[in-house]
């Protein structure tokens, strides 16, 4: 039966490649697809939806980690702690808008001193004339 099935002596089964590696991503496309299906967000989930969502999540994570790493380096630290993530998110305009209602545990608050509480500048005051 020529042309049907595998030929004798073929190389065997192909090595399985994950959808994440096919898309060039680190985030798990299969797990995100499973969560989308189990979450009942829709009756059916397209093949490209979990890949796209994984890519978006990976981009956001990379962006936050890069900014948090910069904040850690500015503070002369080698380990990123929640404080560095808080500083990174709140100093970035777009991330701050996206995560405006999010509370980061152990993140602290942004340093802010009201202008009225700052000491007066010496050169700003005019000398009084008699």
UniProtKB/Swiss-Prot annotation:
Entry PTM: Not ubiquitinated.
MF terms in GO: DNA binding; protein heterodimerization activity; structural constituent of chromatin
Record-level GO BP terms: DNA-mediated transformation; response to bacterium; response to wounding
Renumbered residue ranges of the record's region Disordered: 1-23
Coiled-coil regions listed: none
Keyword terms, alphabetized: Chromosome, DNA-binding, Nucleosome core, Nucleus
Subunit structure and binding partners: The nucleosome is a histone octamer containing two molecules each of H2A, H2B, H3 and H4 assembled in one H3-H4 heterotetramer and two H2A-H2B heterodimers. The octamer wraps approximately 147 bp of DNA. Interacts with VIP1.
Name of the protein in its database record: Histone H2A.6
Taxonomic lineage of the native organism: Eukaryota, Viridiplantae, Streptophyta, Embryophyta, Tracheophyta
Gene symbol of the encoding locus: RAT5
């Amino acid at each position: 039966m020529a042309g049907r099935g595998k030929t004798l002596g073929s190389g065997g089964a192909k090595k399985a490649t994950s959808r994440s590696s096919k898309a060039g991503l680190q985030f798990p496309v299969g797990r995100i697809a499973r969560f989308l299906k189990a979450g009942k967000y829709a009756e059916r989930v397209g093949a490209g939806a979990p890949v796209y969502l994984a890519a978006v999540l990976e981009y956001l994570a990379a962006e936050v980690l890069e900014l948090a790493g910069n904040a850690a380096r500015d503070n002369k630290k080698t380990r990123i702690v929640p404080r560095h993530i808080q500083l990174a998110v709140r100093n970035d305009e777009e991330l701050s808008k996206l995560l405006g209602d999010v509370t980061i545990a152990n993140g602290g608050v942004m340093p802010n001193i009201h202008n009225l509480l700052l000491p007066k500048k010496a050169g700003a005051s005019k000398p009084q004339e008699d």
